[in-house]
Amino acid sequence: MSISRLKRREEFLRVAAGRRKWAAPGLVLQVMRRADGAAPATPGDGPRVGFTVSRKVGGAVERNRVRRRLRSAVERVFEDHAQPGIDYVVIGRRQALGRNFPDLVADLEKAMRRLGAFGQSGSPAQAPEPAKDAAP
């Protein structure tokens, strides 16, 4: 399963508007199921992931290091457990710099389980529901 990237601001904002998030020591994970027509179809409608690390984390070198560590953790976990049709946003926290890599991977797995976005390899799991619009 190929994992596409979220790149546009509107994609990040749509996931954040879904209000499904879990904070762990090294990261914050936001998830949202893509509703029909909400995003252009991707090949195989696989999962998409976006990364963001704010300037509060540190300078460019530290932010890029956090982003690389998170990208590596996501590659390891998503290979077997990401669900198709779901957008994930991973927000890096300052603690991700000094956190052991196995702990960072465990943070991501725990956040995915808590949000109902952790699929077992080879078996479909129930995905989070799309956000309900406030307007009728």
Give residue ranges: language-model regions.
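Positively charged, solvent-exposed patches that mediate nucleic-acid binding
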Residues: M1-P136
